[in-house]
């Protein structure tokens, strides 16, 4: 009995011990847990395309500098004491060097180019030096132009201080020597223009000489036949090109079949659109997009129903020249100091009218101060949007870059 009692007591102790052991379990080692962040794939931020050289230049320009690029002036216009009659007088002394006061005026009116007349030229060395002065005086190098058509209008070849080849007239060259002669004329003229520092020539004459009563064109034109005129015009332009000179085809929409002198009044061409396409416009179709076309103060009432000069006509500059004929080069006005303009419009009206028509470059305003201020004010008050100004200036800058007038 004692043995049984002892065994019973031992079992009881064993159970109690087991129960106590369950109340104090051995801790279990587990691996530490870490919070892992999974990267989320996101699209890279959109990047702006890099600016072109012309856009970089534009982005650093002041408003005055932008407006200035629109103007090609005679250097005499920098002498603000002179009026239009003084500047235009061929017998008065012209500006032949860039003096201190003229350099100061350029800071106020940082123009895009200059055109030199005979009164601005005394001899070969002076001309070379003067063009260099004009080029170096501006942060954005200017167009340096003259009228060297060959024949009657030749500022250098007809100057007594120069011994240069002379041509009787484009009409005579075309009739006698054909396209080869026109090309050689362009090469010769372009060669000496480049030598003296020019980069642009207001030539060739792209008018078709169809009206014997025309007082200003005549044999300045290559031919009375539009097909021949177109071929000869292209040949001369190629010669200028090969000499490093920018050709300017003039005077769109055609000055050949007019009886008026646009220096004095608006010239009128009475032809219909179909007639113009078959004649006057053929030579202008030869102009390429790296070249220029000069628009004349010529009205086409059969197309526009008005006597508005083409220079101020959106339907002719933008509608016909840009859109219908597809020309994408620079469009420059004829002189805004001519009677066709000054008798009917103020300098500011003429400048803004030409820009609104679609012209890029404003040639020789009657009054630089008034024309410049008119454009500047119109941009500042929003009547001529700055975005439109930027578009025009960008075209000018690209053109100067293409022709290595400025560096990228």
Descriptions of predicted regions:
Residues 100-105, 201, 279-289, 317-323:
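Structured alpha-helical segments in the cores of large, soluble enzyme domains
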Residues 1-24:
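Sec-dependent N-terminal signal peptides of Gram-positive bacterial secreted proteins and lipoproteins
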Residues 76-96, 104-229, 251, 256-270, ...:
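Enzymes and membrane/adaptor proteins characterized by extended Gly/Ser/Thr/Asp/Glu-rich
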Residues 232-235, 239-249, 275-290:
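Phosphate/pyrophosphate-binding betaalpha-module
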Residues 136-141, 240-244, 323-328, 382-385:
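Short helix-capping segments at alpha-helix termini
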Residues 318-331, 335:
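Catalytic PLP-binding core of fold-type I/II PLP enzymes
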Residues 20-104, 314, 323-324, 342-408:
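Preference for extracellular/luminal or secreted protein segments
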């Amino acid at each position: 009995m004692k043995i049984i009692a002892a065994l019973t007591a031992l079992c009881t102790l064993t159970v109690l011990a087991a129960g106590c052991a369950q109340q104090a379990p051995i801790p279990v080692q587990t691996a530490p847990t870490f919070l892992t962040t999974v990267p989320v794939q996101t699209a890279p931020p959109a990047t702006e395309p890099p600016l072109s050289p012309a856009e970089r230049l534009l982005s650093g320009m002041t408003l005055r500098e932008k407006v200035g690029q629109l103007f090609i002036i005679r250097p005499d216009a920098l002498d603000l004491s002179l009026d239009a009659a003084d500047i235009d007088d061929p017998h008065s002394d012209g500006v032949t060097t860039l003096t201190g006061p003229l350099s100061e005026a350029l800071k106020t009116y940082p123009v895009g180019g200059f055109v030199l007349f005979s009164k601005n030229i005394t001899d070969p060395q002076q001309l070379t030096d003067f063009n260099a002065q004009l080029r170096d005086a501006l942060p954005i190098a200017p167009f340096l132009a003259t009228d060297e058509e060959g024949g009657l209008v030749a500022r250098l070849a007809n100057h007594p201080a120069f011994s240069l080849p002379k041509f009787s007239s484009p009409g005579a060259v075309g009739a006698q020597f054909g396209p080869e002669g026109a090309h050689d004329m362009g090469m010769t003229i372009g060669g000496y223009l480049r030598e003296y520092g020019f980069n642009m020539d207001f030539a060739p004459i792209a008018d078709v000489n169809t009206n014997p009563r025309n007082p200003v064109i005549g044999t300045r034109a290559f031919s009375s036949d539009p097909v021949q005129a177109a071929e000869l015009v292209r040949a001369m332009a190629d010669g200028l090109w090969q000499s490093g000179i920018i050709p300017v085809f003039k005077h769109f929409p055609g000055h050949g079949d007019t009886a008026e002198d646009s220096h004095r009044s608006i010239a009128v061409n009475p032809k219909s659109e179909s007639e113009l396409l078959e004649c006057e416009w053929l030579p202008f179709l030869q102009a390429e997009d790296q070249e220029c076309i000069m628009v004349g103060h010529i009205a086409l009432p059969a197309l526009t129903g008005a006597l508005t000069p083409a220079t101020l006509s959106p339907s002719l500059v933008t509608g016909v020249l840009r859109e219908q004929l597809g020309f994408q080069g620079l469009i420059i006005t004829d002189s805004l100091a001519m009677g066709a303009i000054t008798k009917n419009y103020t300098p500011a009206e003429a400048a803004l009218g030409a820009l609104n028509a679609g012209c890029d470059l404003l040639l020789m305003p009657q009054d630089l101060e008034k024309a410049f201020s008119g454009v500047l004010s119109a941009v500042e008050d929003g009547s001529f949007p700055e975005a439109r100004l930027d578009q025009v200036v960008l075209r000018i800058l690209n053109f100067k870059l293409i022709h290595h007038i400025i560096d990228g």
